[in-house]
Design a protein with these regions (language model features):
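Sec-dependent signal peptide cleavage junction
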Residues: 15-21
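Extracellular glycan-recognition surfaces and repeat-rich motifs
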Residues: 21-54, 523-546
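Extracellular beta-strand ligand-recognition surfaces/modules
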Residues: 27, 91, 122-154, 615-637
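Secreted extracellular polysaccharide-interacting domains
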Residues: 52-71, 90-92, 98-109, 554-570, ...
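Extra-cytoplasmic beta-strand recognition segments
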Residues: 25-27, 61-89, 119-127, 149-150, ...
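Carbohydrate-active catalytic/glycan-binding domains of CAZyme proteins
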Residues: 165-599, 606-640
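Beta-strand acidic-aromatic groove motif in beta-rich domains, primarily in extracellular
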Residues: 62-63, 86-97, 133-135, 582-589
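Sec-dependent N-terminal signal peptides
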Residues: 4-14
């Protein structure tokens, strides 16, 4: 055991180096950095046989340890396992990989362990293009088990991982490429077939704000980032690490283009004086004959700020260099939470901004912490003093809309609503109505109960109401991606469902669903399509933002386009792509292993090359699956 500790010490001291070596542990000296994965009673301890895992509630409640593996390097991994509870049990040696905070999983090798007998699992593993790697032993239902002699042989990274050349993918001919794809183990998606919610899964996204522009709906979300404790366990979201805002858009509300994560705050942010970027909302206005787009956000709970762009996806600039709303703003000093902006531009071009939240002690029924102010013509200044909206049982999360001649102010209720005469429930979306954008407003009803009532995962409620192509929708957040990942820490994802506006102007209660919105129109594959457009995905990531956003696909990753209309048939497929180490692309119809439309080989060293290949002819409406081998960076694709 002493030899192992020395190796780990050397690796951490040689910052920036890559060192060959062998990690070995028989656990005679302790747990050696291993921890029990999962929540509940699962635990580990060292006994005379090795590392003992017990109290498991599920197969993935297992011993895990993070290893500084280097992308592109191959490792030999082995471990011995024994269980004494079942006649026979299947164990799995697996790896959890994260990229930009999003985890994915891969089973490496399986083995059946008879009761009371040691079994060895051994395999090789080529580390993909990921940020972190956790190796773990799972399976055997909830049986307790012991493992020993865990070994990893290969190159290890220091504290600062250096870039290394990945092993090149060389495909000599079409046959080799076909064999690679036919035998490929595809990565798993976190969005089931038939589910249009959540809107995306490649990152988290909370607190949705909306904007309609050029026949597209844009959704802006808080970019939740997974946080870990000192032992590598996922911990509750503190929101402290959030400094980016996601933006996606769609014309059919099923296939969404990911425009990337806008670097808003932090040292490298557009507003580098801000620490955080929460709860975005957006607006459009023509100023001096030019289209301008305004993105409002809060820097934690102490102010509202604004960015400006010439396109709804950016790039954005910081016009003020400081917050728009602060505690020095009149009538704002006593607002507990100076956050959660909601912007509204009326038909006459006048802009308004709502913000605020929190419940002062003893003021549950009438917190008085919401403010409403008119914006200046430039949308980056205010006119007059912010006024109070007396929203009953308010907690946070403002919204402002106009339907006909009625103005709707909506918000999230607090968590102490019991016994009120209005029928307000905890953590729900309520709404008020008025005949002026500055109020007064009267309470009108409850639109959406807490999402936990539908999905079993309770938490803060945050919403936007939007009219798109003649139908009103509720955009909100839920926690399906973290559930699919097997974690629980209030990491959220955006969803949509329809709103029914009754003849009298009241809003019918909305029911949250995973089915979501039906596709509004067939997808057009003949236009140049951003490669970051997808209905579902598995294992891909999006880097850059605005016109610099690109899709990165690793081995076995894929995206799905839903409902593409091939009314004009197909002759060729073109993709603009790059690959440092070589890659390949397969396009299949209707399922991951469906009829192959075409395949492309992308040689190592390709940079921004347009590849065109012949396709099978196809008619009618089909789903498209774009599957990646090796490593590919894709910009756009098009059918001719």
């Amino acid at each position: 055991m002493k030899r192992v500790l020395v190796l780990v010490f050397v690796l951490m001291m040689l910052s920036g180096a890559a060192l060959a070596g062998v990690y070995e542990s028989d656990f005679s000296g302790g747990t050696d950095g291993w921890y029990a994965r999962g929540t509940g009673e699962a635990a580990i301890e060292v006994n005379e046989l090795g590392l003992y895992t017990y109290g498991r509630q599920a197969t993935w409640n297992s011993p895990g340890r993070q290893f500084p593996l280097i992308p592109g390097e191959e490792y030999k991994i082995s471990v011995e396992v024994m269980q004494e509870e079942k006649d026979s049990a299947e164990f799995i040696l697996s790896v959890e990989r994260t990229k930009l905070g999003i985890a994915s999983y891969q089973n490496l090798v399986f083995a059946d362990a008879k009761k009371g007998e040691w079994v060895t699992m051994s395999t090789t593993y080529l580390a993909g293009s990921y940020d972190t790697f956790v190796l773990y032993v799972e399976g055997a239902a909830n049986a307790s088990f012991t493992m020993r002699n865990f070994a990893v042989e290969g190159l290890f990274a220091g504290e600062e991982v250096v870039e290394v050349d990945e092993e090149q993918l060389v495909l000599k001919n079409d046959k080799e490429r076909k064999q690679m794809f036919d035998r490929m183990e595809l990565q798993k998606t976190m969005k089931l077939t038939g589910q249009n919610n959540p809107l995306f899964t490649q990152r988290f996204g909370a607190d949705p704000g909306v904007l309609v522009w050029n026949d597209r709906l844009y959704v802006y979300t808080t970019n939740d980032v997974i946080e870990y404790d000192a032992e590598g366990n996922v911990k509750e979201n503190t929101y402290a690490k959030i400094n980016k805002i996601n933006v996606i858009s769609s014309s059919d509300l099923v296939n969404w283009t990911d425009h990337g994560a806008i670097p808003v705050a932090g040292a490298n942010g557009i507003a580098d004086w801000a620490n955080n970027s929460w709860a975005p909302c957006a607006a459009h206005k023509v100023i001096d004959g030019k289209d301008k787009f305004f993105l409002y956000f809060c820097n934690g709970g102490n102010g509202v700020s604004v960015l400006v762009a010439d396109d709804p996806a950016g790039p954005f600039t910081d016009p003020l260099g400081h917050a728009l709303i602060t505690r020095a703003t009149p009538n704002c000093a006593d607002v507990l939470w100076l956050f959660d902006p909601a912007v509204f531009v009326d038909q006459d071009g006048t802009g308004y901004l709502c913000f605020g939240g929190g419940v002062p002690e003893g003021m549950t029924a009438n917190p008085g912490t919401i403010r409403l102010v008119q914006l200046g013509d430039d949308m980056i200044s205010i006119v007059g003093e912010p006024q109070v909206i007396d929203a009953p049982y308010v907690f946070e999360d403002s919204g402002m809309n106009r339907i006909g001649d009625t103005y709707y102010y909506s918000y999230c209720s607090n968590w102490n609503t019991g016994g009120n005469e209005l029928g307000i429930t905890n953590g729900a979306i309520e709404y008020m109505t008025g005949k002026s954008p500055m109020g007064p407003f009267e309470y009108a009803g409850e639109l959406f109960v807490n999402q936990g009532r539908f999905f079993g995962l309770y938490g803060n409620n945050h919403h936007s109401i939007v009219e798109f192509k003649g139908q009103h929708y509720l955009v909100y957040h839920n926690r399906p991606v973290e559930k699919a990942m097997g974690i629980s820490g209030n990491y959220r994802s955006p969803q949509m469902d329809k709103i029914t506006v009754n003849e009298d102007g009241s809003l019918a209660p909305v029911r949250g669903t995973m089915t979501g919105i039906d596709q509004l129109s067939a997808f057009n594959p003949y236009e140049k399509v951003s490669a970051t457009t997808m209905y579902r995905e598995a294992g891909v990531s999006v880097e850059g933002y605005a016109d610099k956003a690109v899709l990165k696909g690793g081995n076995g990753s894929w995206i799905q386009i839903k409902g593409a209309d091939f009314a004009n048939g197909a002759k060729t497929f073109t993709m603009k792509a790059s690959s440092k180490s070589g890659g390949a692309v397969r396009v299949a119809l209707d399922r991951t292993f469906g009829d192959v439309l075409c395949e492309i080989t992308i040689p190592a060293g390709s940079e921004g090359v347009e590849f065109t290949v012949d396709t099978k002819n196809v008619k009618d409406i089909h789903d498209l699956y774009i599957i990646f081998g090796g490593n590919v960076e894709a910009e756009w694709w098009q059918i001719h």
